[in-house]
């Protein structure tokens, strides 16, 4: 039938595997402002709570990638330039500046990668540590985060 609305599909994905999902600010089932899909591998068991917790974390903190290996080099290079500009006028020796640069870059990577981020439900641990707490072997293959307006 015809509904008279101009509906255009902007994005689509194809994701297979053990998929978990979460919709934030849900106005009805499956409809909200932020949606997350998560694909994990595990050697055994039901990981519904784990999947939901990781999806909620992704919705809240918006990581750019799973790990620093997955970040585009251009993204890292832009941040390095920003850090260099911040440190340039500090007047400190070059060896100190290098260490400060490494520390700031490490913090940036932790804040922008899923495995490096502090777990939103328990900030005393990282997502990597949260995964390691599980008895079964779990690995995160992929995540997709959609937000209305982005």
Which residue stretches match the model-derived regions?
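N-terminal assembly/interaction segments in proteins that build large macromolecular machines
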Residues: 1-150
């Amino acid at each position: 039938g015809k509904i008279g609305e101009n509906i255009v599909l902007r994005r689509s994905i194809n994701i297979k595997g053990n998929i978990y999902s979460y919709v934030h600010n849900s106005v009805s089932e499956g409809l909200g402002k932020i949606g997350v899909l998560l694909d994990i591998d595990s050697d055994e068991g039901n990981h519904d709570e784990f999947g939901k917790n990781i999806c909620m974390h992704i919705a809240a903190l918006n990581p750019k990638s799973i790990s620093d290996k997955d970040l585009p080099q251009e993204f890292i290079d832009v941040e390095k330039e920003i850090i260099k500009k911040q440190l340039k006028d500090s007047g400190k020796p070059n060896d100190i500046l290098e260490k400060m640069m490494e520390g700031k870059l490490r913090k940036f990577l932790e804040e922008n990668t899923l495995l490096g981020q502090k777990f939103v439900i328990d900030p005393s641990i990282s997502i990597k540590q949260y995964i390691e707490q599980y008895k079964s072997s779990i690995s995160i293959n992929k995540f997709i985060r959609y937000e209305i307006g982005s």
